[in-house]
């Protein structure tokens, strides 16, 4: 008769559960969540006991995974989420919560004592003799402090009020600017046309760009935006705007914040490689409002963009020349100024006068070269005097 396998006393203290305890922020928007369960998949970060690990897809678009990091017993004792380890009531880190409520007690430090402490509390929770932290013992001032910390928002510097042309309004730095909170377009490029940043010619040269912005010698500049860019098309099913001129450091969330002010966005497809994006609205009215407000151009975080109606299509099939043209298309919507010496800021208005005006300016700025030898110094010794 083969010898019987003895019961492992250490394994008897390991935790095995059928459902996690997580907060709503860690769960996806889809109510039907598919979770993967792994018995004794990892060790708890607090009590170091093996526990049942649950993992699920947090974002369907990016296939990002989330998982539980502490066991269910420690989560119940700390009243925290198993995934983000934040307090379930206030949404704060448990260290800040315990410091404010003065609930910090010296716990076991060694690994074996942590396991013993967790096993005893697990048995007490099952019998109903123990539970979460006793919040009722904390005074009302500490609880009010936690409420203020949970409701706190990041501080943003209020910008000055600007008009439609980007000029500061008189008196905006006084009471008027503080009363209205400033214009969110300043600095962030949200809600209106803001200042356009200059192009770094040295960085472009280091990246291997051709002189003159990389345009081919025989390529004609793109025309400025016209009524055909912002007038709604006859096809009522078109509810998308084509945005070009997106630079590499312009994040997607700033583009979304800019265009969601006109209506609810169904989807936003941004391709930094192609320097273009498609903004798909849920309603035709929102798309028409955004197109009429932009008038074929927009400035987001100092990045000039061209906005026009279009039908959604694939953005990853462009070649190198087409991608470069998409990048230049944004600045061509605002007109380009001639650079003399260093960098020059590009204004928000179109260049007037066309090619004839540019030729006149070039002709007036021409200087006649001096004859050869005029700059040589005439010494008396060379003349024989």
Swiss-Prot record:
Keyword Transmembrane appears in the UniProt entry: no
Principal subcellular localisation of the protein: nucleus
Role played: Involved in pre-mRNA splicing. Facilitates the cooperative formation of U2/U6 helix II in association with stem II in the spliceosome. Binds to RNA.
SUPFAM superfamilies, alphabetized: RNA-binding domain, RBD (SSF54928)
Pfam families in UniProt: RRM_1, STL11_N
Subcellular location(s) per record: Nucleus
Biased composition annotated in UniProt, kind: Basic and acidic residues: 320-331
PROSITE patterns assigned: RRM (PS50102)
UniProt protein name: Pre-mRNA-splicing factor slt-11
Family: Belongs to the SLT11 family.
Compositionally biased intervals (Low complexity): 171-187
Alphabetical list of InterPro entries matching this protein: Cwc2/Slt11, Nucleotide-bd_a/b_plait_sf, RBD_domain_sf, RRM_dom, Slt11_RRM, STL11/RBM22-like_N
Protein's organism: Neurospora crassa (strain ATCC 24698 / 74-OR23-1A / CBS 708.71 / DSM 1257 / FGSC 987)
Biological process terms in GO annotation: mRNA processing; RNA splicing
GO cellular component annotations of the record: post-mRNA release spliceosomal complex; Prp19 complex; U2-type catalytic step 1 spliceosome; U2-type catalytic step 2 spliceosome
Domain RRM, first and last residues per copy: 239-312
Record's keyword terms, sorted: mRNA processing, mRNA splicing, Nucleus, RNA-binding, Spliceosome
Subunit field text: Associated with the spliceosome.
Molecular function per GO: pre-mRNA binding; U6 snRNA binding
Keyword Nucleus listed: yes
Region (Disordered): 157-233, 320-370
Listed PANTHER family: PRE-MRNA-SPLICING FACTOR RBM22 (PTHR14089:SF6)
